[in-house]
């Protein structure tokens, strides 16, 4: 007999809502317990501000877009009881909010690097170095902790202005008051996933630990949807709300790549690669960090600045689908390409001065399809280097890769990724972080992997083409050589089979 669900429904009849706060928009998906998507919605985010190292968005627009996306997802099921709702957000994005979870300033985005231009006093930097040693990884300028220090130095944190991570902020808007955070979102605010907030270290860098939120396990119930939020979103009032996660972890959940050796590669605006290990992976360079697995163990990975946003930057007015048709029959390009917009890379290597480049035969051409082709190859080589980096740190990086994110819809690009990686790449039927948040909303405590296996279906499997292996291995060597020439990675020996 099915277990009772919310409001007297049966578990098998309940629907689960996932909300994904992305860089360019908000997405929502309504999912059944068997993984069937019953409704989807999305809304763009248009009021962002980029100015050098500054990158801000309007948290009010996050809430407006959340309402629009959720109303669209629920359109065919008005008033249907929901099992629970869960929200994911971009890792490292921070906002100040009041006692009713309303914003009192702009959202400082995950890649806002103003801390580079406004270094902390020497005593604070020394305390940050001590904190980094305690955490076992550096505290880079884009971490939420650095943003928090910047806000504190400006006197903007106080009783009526407490920090919240992006996903927690929208979760709080749903509940009607601030909510606890989870270990994945708190990591870049300096939270120690093994021992909690390092209060003594935070005191020494000048932050009051009392201003920081409580931390609960990912997926823990944190409240119910308030009447005002119900009117705004269409979610029935009283629907359970659970602590969310980062967009990268949500995408990993959507892939069901939660067993050691399996990896989830989310290629969208940026590239995020995550896997599962029984022991925590430590990277002294800070390119790789590990989240707590809600089931136990660890979820190591990293997030690059490289990603598909380079297409719109380098090829304005051109649609990737049109360029794909023209690019699919082109030969492996000569030279090397790094697909980066802006300055600075954080994974699979840390190089604050890194910029995109395109070198060798065919570089600098004006044909959009050839330019798209070279950028696509660059993305695949970044992904291969990322897996190599994880393997050198001791992670089991030999297994299947599951591709999620918007780029997974491009079959040519996904096949290219399988060919460059020289391993099978799976594409789930539903590849977005919103789906992963819906899985998290449904998962009982300690059963996230089992819930994901039950809900996630494979739509395609791409096998690597052995006829292309030698040419692509040579291309990867050129790629590594170009990075080493710039001092971004150490010189490498001949790459073997991944």
Regions found by a protein language model. Give the residues of each.
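Glycine- and other small-residue-rich loops at beta-strand/loop junctions that grip anionic moieties
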Residues: 108, 140, 218, 243, ...
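Structured loop/turn residues at beta-strand edges in well-structured enzyme cores
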Residues: 80, 210, 396
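Short beta-strand-loop/turn "lid" adjacent to the catalytic site in phosphate-handling enzymes
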Residues: 75-110, 136-142, 167, 171-191, ...
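Residue-level signal for inorganic ion chemistry
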Residues: 35, 58, 85, 112, ...
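Short glycine/proline- and acidic residue-enriched helix-loop micro-motifs
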Residues: 54-56, 128-138, 211-212
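Active-site core segments that coordinate phosphate-bearing ligands/cofactors
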Residues: 17-18, 116, 123-135, 145-165, ...
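N-terminal glycine/serine-rich phosphate-binding loop of ATP-dependent small-molecule kinases
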Residues: 1-106, 133, 159, 230-231, ...
